[in-house]
Design a protein with these regions (language model features):
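Short hinge/gating elements
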Residues: 44-55, 205-214, 267, 277-281, ...
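C-terminal tails and terminal domains of large nucleic-acid-associated
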Residues: 827-860
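ATPase nucleotide-binding head domains, primarily ABC-like/P-loop NTPase cores
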Residues: 28-31, 217, 285, 290, ...
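Amphipathic alpha-helical
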Residues: 78-95, 539-547, 554, 722
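Amphipathic heptad-repeat alpha-helical coiled-coil/stalk segments that mediate oligomerization
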Residues: 191-199, 255, 266-268, 359-434, ...
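Extended, charged coiled-coil "arm/hinge" scaffolds of SMC/Rad50-like chromosome-maintenance ATPases
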Residues: 401, 486-524
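Charged catalytic and DNA/RNA-contacting regions of genome-maintenance
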Residues: 1-316, 325, 329-332, 336-345, ...
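Charged, surface-exposed helical/loop "interaction arms" that form contiguous linear patches used
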Residues: 346, 360-363, 416-417, 443-451, ...
């Protein structure tokens, strides 16, 4: 066990899979955890008088069990036998060959082929927070730095599987970003400027980082260098496929905070059976295309020339259906080229995967020719990035058999004719008996010993056997060596026979050894082609995204948006891209027109019944703007759009009870984040703001927020404001930039029909009781609610809502305890003041001042 403990000491926080013959064994705590996760038998063995827990599984079951351990949140270190056991050696040489963690793996069975598997590192400084992301399975490497809010947004966007932090920052990290992330702590000395910068310079073989555009990002450089150090500790010592480091430049992409990404359901639906936007738009044929599309979606473009470049490419393919279908059929054949290439420098690529690379290179040529002939500039550019790597394709064809096995430990990988020694060994394995017979015949002919035979024993191997009849006739050549005398004759060996014996007995083992040597030479040859192979994968991924957009546009009847410089958003017959795909067969989505600008139509105050479609109208407007700025066509008849630089949403309830925050507190936090980050190119979605508190508090807050948004001089954000507070319709009478709209309904025989059409003017009813009835509320409750509503509306119409003589305005159940009688004197005074007040005569600000006065009286 001494060797085991030495290996375990290298990675004490990982489960150590210790290779013993044909099994991987785990011991002590590792065994208990492994047994629990995998459901395998836990036993004990005697270890010097002490029992130690033991659990293991056959080596060929690693592919099945390893993913379960990693997905359960464990780091796993694999300790392999580095030599074959021999009789004279008690302890076999072993070494740790791989350390797999949630954020560090190239194992296809552990990876979601349509998602990146990012490892992140976060570095705190007094001014900013630095962050770095790397996906070792693809070679992508990013850095950025900024405020806590910005880093939180990046974490929500990139969704790292694991985050590396320094030990002393653990509490701060959890305070800022919560405890839901899988984190790993490194010693503080690693997160230092000098150490991490040296790591980066050494890795990229440069004198400075100016060429990557990250020279001035000192805080995020520390995070990036720490990631490289961490990769080394996981036995990834040569990740040369991480060939560049890129800055996530906030000034190049639309700002969306984590609330917006969640509320717009870009990646995940808020409902278990719902769909997200990525599920609609991702029609990619390759895994690398799907991963790139996700990145485009969370990082929409700001530069109009790049947006138009993508849109024009999509447009050129939408009108050429035959070409589009041909390209998509060809892309489907490539598989995950990006992740295949990443295995080359890590020396973890199999013979069959090398063949896949060769076959992909052969498929590139027709795609390059098609794109080069196309008139679109972006498609021509992608053609120029494709490299056929003919020398590599030729070398693989020379060396690797077309039916090569998946593992190098099995023979049959290297082509016949490539290695003379290998061909001889294969001939020996196939024709060993015939070769022995040839020697027997040749020696019998030379010596005249006609009954000469070749035999074999375990003591001295192959031998020539001469009977007594010939042993004293002087026929035995001098170069024969006598090894054994028997009663029937004598046994001899020759140099030729021993050489053949060595070849025959060691041929199969030598074949595997030689094939491995030749294969490793090929992998070294392939190192020089990693960069062009990566460029091929990136070009194919971008082409895949463009063709996916074109295919989706054709299938879903999307149109190309146009952009203007006058801050106008004018969308005709806009549809929600997700909801329209979820409607029952035969039911059509009701489209709506939207017009927004920074002047007369800055804020649309949208009222209407519950379930009428207000929220859908808000979301579809933002989604259409986002889709356009990632280069996609949009679900509308036409659209004139201005560039949006920030998208904010305050929609839906999102309690954070676990951290002690109520719905209303979360709502106010999200709203405050919006109001503090506005610009004149922002679009803001406010859905039912203020509903988490009392009615008049809610109205007051919503009113004040609408006023604030309208009165901004230089940050006049375009706003869609959905509300059930019909009192807010009065804002349109006071402010030129606010316009009232409502989602229309039709009431027939006391039944509400939702027409889902946005029309000018405010609405006076929410039809909440009708919705309750539709939800299956007991009829007694529905009837009672209608009675109360009727009395409330009658009282309000007659101005008696706050009249102290209207106690019996609503019929009350018997035995009700009068509130005033149960209150202390001070509370009773406030109560009477509230009862006698006509709130309809107060402005929102006066209401808020009155509330503050009451809170002071009540010592709240």
């Amino acid at each position: 066990m001494e060797q085991y403990y030495a290996m375990k000491a290298k990675h004490p926080d990982a489960i150590l899979l210790y290779r013993v013959g044909d099994f991987y064994e785990t011991f002590a705590t590792d065994a208990i955890q492994t047994s629990n996760v995998l459901g395998i038998v836990l036993t004990k063995r005697n270890n010097g008088g002490n029992d130690i827990e033991l659990a293991g599984f056959p080596y060929h079951s690693l592919d099945a069990y390893l993913p379960k351990l990693v997905r359960a949140g464990f780091r796993v270190a694999i300790c392999e036998q580095l030599e074959k056991p021999s009789k004279g050696k008690k302890v076999v040489k072993r070494g740790i060959t791989d350390v797999i963690t949630p954020g560090v793996t190239t194992d296809d069975k552990l990876l979601d082929h349509r998602k990146n598997n990012f490892l992140a590192a976060v570095n705190f400084s007094p001014q900013v927070i630095g962050i770095s992301f790397v996906d070792i399975s693809t070679g992508e490497f990013y850095v950025s730095e900024g405020s806590e809010q910005y880093i939180n947004k990046l974490l929500q966007s990139f969704r790292p599987s694991e985050i590396v932090i320094k030990k002393s920052s653990k509490a701060l990290f959890e305070k800022c970003f919560g405890e839901s992330y899988y984190t790993y702590c490194l010693e503080d000395w690693i997160f230092t400027d000098e150490f991490t910068r040296e790591k980066l310079l050494k890795h990229f073989k440069v004198l400075n980082l100016k060429g990557f555009g990250v020279e001035d990002l000192i805080v995020s450089q520390v995070a990036a260098g720490s990631i490289l150090y961490y990769l080394e500790t996981t036995e990834n010592h040569n990740p040369t496929h991480i060939s560049q480091i890129s800055k996530i430049a906030s000034e190049e992409y639309v700002w969306m905070d984590r609330f917006t990404i969640r509320n717009l359901e870009l990646i995940d639906s808020l409902h278990p059976e719902g769909s997200s936007l990525i599920q609609i738009l991702d029609q990619c044929k390759t895994p690398m295309g799907s991963r790139l599309l996700r990145r485009w979606m969370i990082l929409p473009l700001l530069k109009i020339n790049k947006i138009q470049e993508r849109l024009n490419a999509v447009d050129s393919l939408v009108t050429q259906s035959e070409l589009l279908d041909d390209l998509r059929d060809r892309l489907h054949l490539f598989g995950d080229m990006e992740r295949l290439v990443s295995k080359i420098p890590l020396l973890r690529i199999s013979p069959r995967e090398v063949l896949h690379i060769k076959n992909n290179l052969l498929k590139l040529k027709p795609i390059k020719e098609i794109l080069a002939k196309h008139s679109d500039p972006l498609l021509q550019y992608l053609a120029s990035k494709i490299n056929g790597c003919e020398a590599l394709e030729e070398q693989i064809s020379k060396q690797i058999k077309d039916d090569a096995p998946n593992q190098i430990i099995k023979s049959g990988v290297i082509q016949d004719g490539f290695s003379k020694e290998l061909d001889e060994l294969r001939y020996i394995v196939t024709n060993g008996k015939d070769l022995l017979l040839d020697i027997q015949k040749e020696e019998a002919l030379k010596t005249g010993i006609t009954n000469l035979k070749i035999g074999f024993n375990s003591v001295f191997g192959y031998f020539l056997e001469v009977t007594n009849k010939y042993k004293n006739q002087g026929l035995i050549p001098d170069h024969w060596v006598r090894k054994q005398t028997m009663s029937t004759g004598e046994r001899y060996i020759t140099d030729e026979l021993k050489k053949l014996e060595t070849k025959i007995l060691g041929a199969e083992e030598r074949i595997i050894q030689l094939e491995e040597e030749i294969f490793n030479q090929l992998i070294q040859f392939m190192q020089d082609y990693v960069l062009p192979l990566q460029q091929n994968a990136h070009a194919l991924a971008e082409l895949d995204c463009i063709t996916s957009f074109a295919h989706t546009a054709q299938k879903n009847n999307y149109t190309k948006p146009n952009f203007n410089d006058n801050h106008v958003i004018h969308i005709k017959s806009a549809r929600h891209p997700v909801i329209e795909k979820q409607l029952p067969v035969g039911e059509s989505y009701i489209p709506n027109d939207i017009y927004l600008d920074n002047d007369a139509y800055q804020i649309l105050m949208i009222t209407g019944p519950n379930m009428s479609g207000k929220s859908a109208i808000l979301r579809q407007t933002a989604l259409i703007c986002l889709m356009a700025q990632i280069g996609s066509f949009i679900p509308a008849e036409s659209a004139e759009l201005s560039i949006i630089d920030r998208i904010f949403t305050r929609v839906g309830a999102s309690d954070n009870i676990s951290s002690g925050e109520s719905t209303f507190m979360v709502e106010m936090n999200e709203t405050a984040s919006i109001l503090n980050n506005l610009s004149d190119r922002s679009i803001v979605l406010m859905d039912e703001i203020g509903r988490g508190t009392s009615t008049y508090d809610g109205i007051s807050i919503a009113w004040s927020i609408a006023e604030f948004l309208h009165e901004q001089t230089h940050q006049k954000a375009k706003t869609l404001f959905a509300t059930h507070y019909h009192e807010l319709n009065e804002l349109a009478l006071q402010y030129n930039g606010i316009k009232n709209f409502h989602v229309s309904t039709q009431e027939i025989n006391n039944k509400v029909i939702f027409l889902r059409k946005l029309v000018a003017g405010g609405s006076e009813h929410s039809f909440g009781i009708h919705v309750a009835e539709m939800a299956g509320m007991p009829s007694s409750i529905v009837n009672r609610a209608n009675e109360i509503l009727h009395d409330l509306e009658s009282s309000r119409a007659s101005g008696k809502m706050a009249d102290s003589n209207s106690e019996n305005m609503i019929p009350k159940p018997n035995l009700q305890i009068k509130l005033a009688e149960a209150l202390p004197e001070q509370e009773r005074k406030v109560y009477e003041e509230i009862r006698n007040m006509d709130i309809n005569t107060l402005s929102p600000i006066e209401c808020m001042m009155k509330i503050a006065e009451w809170r002071k009286k009540l010592n709240l």
